[in-house]
């Protein structure tokens, strides 16, 4: 197993020095799910939710969150993202919403945390907008699906 890159020889957490790393194109995809009652999902899908367009709000929240990842997670670097995409899909047969995020840049460090943050915050936004209707929604799983670029190469979750 690899060593933790954020821990120094004394066991202290530090931000990784990426100054000597080569810039490469890096991309990451993540997903999150929000499980809910059929009635709650129907309110979202039909556009009848009293707070407005849940998917549009969650999409914007996810994009905003990706851009703020460095501000939320202490050891993440501030990144100049070139792409953030958040897609939401109602899976009515399973009473859930699937969120997929994609983040991309040309840089010295990966965008996995940005993709995970985008998907997570989009899921939290759905919960926030729907909690008046249903409080027992479940968020999860949240996971990295794929990452490309950088020294560690290509990672993809097996289907």
UniProtKB/Swiss-Prot annotation:
Pathway info: Cofactor biosynthesis; molybdopterin biosynthesis
Enzyme class: lyase
Family matches, as InterPro entries: MoaC (IPR023045), MoaC_bact/euk (IPR047594), MoaC_sf (IPR036522), MoCo_biosynth_MoaA/MoaC (IPR050105), Mopterin_CF_biosynth-C_dom (IPR002820)
SUPFAM superfamilies in UniProt: Molybdenum cofactor biosynthesis protein C, MoaC
Keyword hit for rRNA-binding: no
Keywords on record: Lyase, Molybdenum cofactor biosynthesis
Residue ranges of coiled coil: none
Catalyzed reactions per annotation: (8S)-3',8-cyclo-7,8-dihydroguanosine 5'-triphosphate = cyclic pyranopterin phosphate + diphosphate
Active-site residues, Swiss-Prot/TrEMBL: 128
EC number in record: 4.6.1.17
A Pfam family of this chain: MoaC
An MF annotation (GO) of this entry: cyclic pyranopterin monophosphate synthase activity
Keyword 4Fe-4S assigned: no
Subunit structure: Homohexamer; trimer of dimers.
Family note: Belongs to the MoaC family.
Protein purpose: Catalyzes the conversion of (8S)-3',8-cyclo-7,8-dihydroguanosine 5'-triphosphate to cyclic pyranopterin monophosphate (cPMP).
Protein name as it appears in the record: Cyclic pyranopterin monophosphate synthase
Organism whose genome encodes this protein: Vibrio vulnificus (strain YJ016)
Gene: moaC
């Amino acid at each position: 197993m690899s060593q933790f890159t954020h821990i120094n020889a004394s066991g202290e957490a530090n931000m990784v020095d990426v100054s000597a790393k080569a810039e490469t194109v890096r991309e990451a995809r993540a997903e999150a799910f929000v499980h809910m009652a059929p009635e709650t999902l129907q309110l979202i899908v039909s556009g009848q939710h009293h707070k407005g367009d849940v998917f549009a709000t969650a999409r914007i929240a996810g994009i905003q969150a990706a851009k703020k990842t460095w501000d939320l997670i202490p050891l993440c670097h501030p990144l100049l993202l070139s792409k953030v995409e958040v897609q939401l899909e109602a899976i009515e047969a399973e009473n859930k919403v699937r969120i997929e995020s994609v983040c991309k840049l040309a840089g010295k460090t990966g965008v996995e945390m940005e993709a995970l943050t985008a998907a997570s915050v989009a899921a939290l936004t759905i919960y926030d907008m729907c909690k008046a209707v249903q409080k027992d929604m479940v968020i999860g799983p949240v996971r990295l699906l794929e990452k490309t670029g950088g020294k560690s190469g290509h990672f993809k979750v097996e289907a």
